[in-house]
């Protein structure tokens, strides 16, 4: 009787152990939940990876480059609602910014800030004028681009926006649809342009980027294919 009771007691303990053991799926979920939560917090408030979709920012950024976007540079926003809960800074001329395309907010664009609220921007003869003053441009050297597989002779120039400098691609003989114009940047808006000036769909075509559409400031390139 004692042996039977002992065996029965052991069996009961094994049964209780099996019943008390969590399913494998629950164990995995419990293990991965903190990781998923951390990733969600990082992507929502701190940094988010972004893949360059086009050549409009050549030579600064190339199609296929992966960059990290600093999402708190211009304030902390609530996910989904996109409501700003903390103001940290404002975009400055020369910043490279990721934003939601005003005509289709489901699409992210990346361009350089040329005009901030109150600025008068004009573009003539491939030169930017800010409040009547031409942005400095200095010739760097020749450059050949192959946008359609056919060589397109171009040149590289250094453009100065205040203390910030960056390199542009200019196509001297290319008369694009965004050759000239004048704009006054409204409060709460920003004027954006690509560094590949004659091959960029930007504020010259569709207007200003509202402050609420800003995603963050472009940071380091963490992967490219060149």
Where in the sequence are the language-model features?
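Hydrophobic membrane-insertion alpha-helices, especially the h-region
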Residues: 30-45
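Soluble "head" domains of membrane/secretory-pathway proteins
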Residues: 1-26, 45-51, 56-226
